[in-house]
A protein has these predicted regions:
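Membrane-interface coil-to-helix junctions
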Residues: 15-104, 126-138, 142-150, 282-360, ...
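Extracytoplasmic/lumenal acceptor-recognition loop(s) of multi-pass membrane glycoenzymes
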Residues: 45-77, 81, 297, 309, ...
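Contiguous transmembrane helix-bundle modules in multi-pass membrane proteins
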Residues: 125, 140-150, 162-163, 184-196, ...
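Polar, glycine-rich mid-to-C-terminal structural blocks
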Residues: 206, 236-296
């Protein structure tokens, strides 16, 4: 027992050393310069500042991006969840080392749950955790995705442990309920916690892929029981019921995130547009073309085994001393070639661009194929099924019949994009089955004849393919990319030579790894004699060591010292520019800024200081996305053309055209240069304005079209879902969109105080008046009241703004964002998390009592 504990302790220490040794920069305080995290810092700055200063009044809304939006996908809701602190404890440490360590530990438990001996299980954990995709997403800043992937093997391990505890009787053996039930209950409790934490990472798409693996496991288990062990069906249902009930508690503990996310998603790009497209009614879900834009090509699948089969990354590194491209650029006198060599356009596959391949490891792929021919257990089938599903989903538009079936008929699938991500399923299934068969070989589970047949077939497929790549690369493509079209031919030729060289290098590497693995297995299977058991173990450990060397070496291409910076360097991108300082002198509590020095709708850095017209989010409100496509982008292009020839700021302001939709969003400043004064948009409508009429649309298509013809200063455009709203004015007839008395007489409304979740206005009106606010309408959570508590109904105006009808007099109007779903979901989280903790304690106590 002590020896066993020492082995496990040694492996854990090894994992800690590996995680921090792979990213030693974190020990000196450096962080990964993650583009997505810098974007997050910009978009969440207002929210984080407010919450830090007002811990008892946390905001669920931010005005910092896209005119305003819920913070559901930024900071979320953590109220009520008693398991949150336990979750945070697991992530203690310096990231990304803490992420890698969490993944290593979970994958190790997963391998152990399959019965793999510890030393080989450690090799399998490395194969899982150092797949190139993990390191790529760490490098770009997809931290939530990485944490979700790190928790995934914990969930699988707990589920497998639960079923094995209930069903592991040997043929003819019959354990009593006291022998199997406590361990089964404990496994279900661990499953609930692992599932709770995996969902808490907040990446539903990864959780969806986890569900595919789990369902495959359960279905195959049912078939196996029906064919082989019908007597155990009762225990299966007990284990399943425990997993279901406790799993629901784990899910329920996350209700404070899941329910607001579900409510918000209905209003976003994931919920679909109200507009008709190509004659079809508005669909609910992402557009299929958008969802499948990043589809893995059939021709890319070999890079599961040969990393640079399609060039690797769109901005990949080469050896400057050996690169034909760098040599050419040096001959032409280009400077700074050391930096250029780190970001050449090497990828030549079908995706728009990529951070790198989904490299699973040449050894892992070889072992997986070996297992398909050699392994006879049920595990082969429940691991093969999700593998095939993952490949089919990742192919996206290259395999449209399969993609359309999932998109139109499988629940929630049409909410996801970047379908190539489905290959993460293989990060688990390939190492699981591969190291399962390796463990059986080490345990002397196969005779030489069976191994020879399956081994030679697997070696021919992997090693033979790699050899063919080395000898005849021209068989596998032109090595030209679509992005090469705008380059000079001599440069394209140099890039092609580099791509072929990288292709051959990695094919040769994979050939060597597969050959070494095959040779070690052949050596392990030599005729039995004294010491043959040790020989098999040495071979297994040597193969695990090769996996470690290969996966970390390839991984360094995607996460290395060049990607780390000091905290000061990272923060420098958020220093105030002269133009920011000029804008921030404005004492008005709220106005919006259009920053043309960045990609307006794909960059959230301006949100750090300003209420930004643009930003970045794949889950922005759908109506705002419609506004971008129909009006904001055309108006921005018109603005750029109008001021393009101006020599001074005043000339640019004089040339500034009237931009009705940007103006209704209260876009007061336009940034053209970091170091110059901003343009002032004299047409901005302000924070709120009275209107005296309405134009009404019968459909959503008519509603958005009317924005282009109405005088938005004088009338409100109302959609069909607000047809009952009465605007206190004379009716607007025909095409006369502007009432004669649109401006009103002496009435005024002014924003007096701004907070992200509360707005205060003072107004004076001689009669009931309709008002439009330059604030984004959201159907759930915003309320408006007068100073005496009288509620005021809000409606949607001008496609995406808020409107209200105010009573006559001098009043204060308060708008506040307090979504009911936050209170309800926090209560559910509180109940479920408390029950989960109590049941876990009871399950642990029961197990030890039975043992005693």
């Amino acid at each position: 027992m002590k020896k066993s504990l020492l082995v496990y302790a040694g492996i854990v220490v090894f994992f800690v050393a590996l995680a921090y040794g792979f990213t030693p920069q974190v020990l000196s305080g450096k962080i990964v310069n993650q583009s997505d995290i810098s974007g997050y810092v910009g978009m969440a700055h207002e929210t984080n500042q407010w919450n830090a200063a007002h811990p008892d009044d946390r905001t669920a809304w931010t005005g910092s991006m896209f005119g305003g939006m819920p913070t559901t996908m930024l900071t979320g809701n953590t109220e009520g969840d008693w398991t949150q602190k336990i979750y945070d404890l697991f992530l203690t440490g310096r990231r990304p080392a803490s992420y890698l360590l969490l993944s290593l530990l979970g994958a190790f438990l997963l391998m152990l749950s399959l019965g793999i001996r510890p030393l080989l299980a450690a090799g399998g954990a490395v194969a899982v955790s150092f797949c190139s995709y993990n390191l790529q997403i760490i490098q770009v800043g997809h931290n939530a995705k990485m944490v979700a992937l790190a928790w995934l093997p914990w969930v699988l391990a707990a589920a497998i442990y639960t079923y094995r505890s209930a069903l592991s009787d040997a043929p003819g053996e019959k354990r009593g309920i006291r022998q199997w039930l406590p361990r089964t209950v404990l496994g279900a409790a661990l499953f609930a916690f692992a599932l709770d934490f995996q969902i808490k990472a907040n990446h539903v798409q990864i959780s969806y892929y986890l569900a595919i693996i789990l369902f495959s496991y359960v279905i195959v288990l049912i078939v196996w029981l029906a064919l082989r062990r019908r007597a155990l069906f009762g225990r299966f249902f007990v284990a399943s019921a425990l997993l279901l009930v406790l799993g629901l508690l784990g899910i329920g503990a996350n209700a404070n995130r899941l329910l607001p996310t579900y409510e918000y998603t209905q209003q976003t790009m994931r919920g679909g547009s109200d507009l008709t497209r190509d004659g079809d009614s508005g669909s609910k879900g992402l557009d299929l073309d958008y969802a499948t834009a990043w589809s893995y090509g059939w021709e890319e699948l070999p890079n599961l085994m040969i990393p640079d089969f399609n060039g690797g990354a769109s901005a990949g590194a080469v050896n400057p001393d050996k690169s034909a491209t760098i040599r050419l650029l040096r001959d032409y006198g280009q400077q700074n070639l050391a930096q250029t060599a780190k970001a050449l356009p090497l990828y030549w596959g079908p995706q728009p661009f990529t951070a790198g391949p989904m490299y699973m490891g040449a050894i892992t792929v070889f072992l997986f194929l070996l297992a398909l021919g050699l392994y006879r257990g049920k595990e082969k089938w429940w691991l093969l099924i999700p593998t095939l599903i993952g490949v089919g989903l990742a192919l996206g538009y290259h395999f449209m019949p399969f993609t359309r079936f999932w998109y139109y008929y499988m629940p929630f699938y049409n909410k996801f994009r970047t379908v190539s991500m489905a290959l993460v399923i293989l990060q688990y299934t390939l190492p699981m089955l591969g190291f399962l068969v390796l463990d059986r070989i080490v345990r002397d589970g196969y005779d030489r004849k069976a191994f020879r047949k399956a081994g030679l077939a697997a070696f021919a497929l992997t090693g033979g393919f790699s050899l063919l790549c080395c000898l005849a690369p021209g068989l596998f493509g032109t090595f030209s990319a679509a992005s090469d079209a705008g380059m000079q031919e001599v440069l394209v030729d140099a890039l092609v030579r580099d791509r072929i060289a990288l292709f051959r290098r990695d094919a040769l590497m994979s050939l060597g790894l597969v050959a070494a693995t095959f040779a070690l297995l052949w050596w392990a299977g030599l005729p039995k004699k004294e010491g043959s058991a040790d020989r098999r173990l040495y071979a297994g450990v040597a193969i695990s060591a090769l996996v470690l060397i290969n996966m970390t070496a390839v991984g360094k291409r995607y996460l290395n010292a060049d990607h780390f910076v000091s905290q000061r360097q990272f923060d420098s991108q958020f220093r105030e520019r002269p133009v920011d300082q000029a804008i921030l002198q404005d004492s008005d509590p709220s106005y919006r800024v259009l920053d043309l020095t960045v990609n307006v709708f794909n960059d959230s850095h301006p949100s750090y200081f300003h209420k930004n017209i643009g930003g970045y989010s794949p889950v922005k409100l759908q109506r705002y996305q419609d506004l971008i496509e129909q009006y904001l982008s055309p108006e921005i292009n018109a603005l750029a053309r109008a001021v393009g020839g101006a020599r001074t700021v005043s000339e640019a302001e004089d040339a500034l055209p009237e931009l009705p939709v940007l103006s209704m969003l209260n876009t007061r400043y336009v940034v053209l240069d970091d170091n110059a004064a901003p343009l002032v948009n004299r047409y901005a409508l302000g924070n709120a304005w009275f209107v005296d009429g309405a134009v009404r649309a019968g459909t959503a298509d008519e509603e958005i079209a009317l924005l282009g013809g109405a005088d938005l200063r004088g009338v409100a455009v109302l959609g069909p879902d607000f047809a009952s709203v009465e605007i206190p004015s004379r009716p607007v007839a025909g095409a006369d969109l502007v009432p004669e008395d649109a401006a009103g007489s002496g009435d005024e409304i002014v924003l007096t105080d701004y907070a992200p979740n509360a707005l205060r206005y003072r107004y004076s009106a001689g009669a009931p008046r309709a008002v439009v606010f330059s604030e984004i309408y959201y159907p759930s959570g915003w309320t408006a009241t007068l100073e005496d508590g009288t509620p005021v109904d809000l409606f949607r105006a001008d496609w995406t703004l808020r409107g209200a009808v105010l009573p006559a007099g001098d009043h204060e109007l308060v708008m506040r964002f307090d979504p009911p779903v936050y209170r309800v979901s926090s209560s559910i989280s509180r109940v479920c998390s408390i029950l989960l903790i109590l049941l876990a304690l009871l399950a642990t106590g029961a197990k030890f009592l039975v043992r005693a």
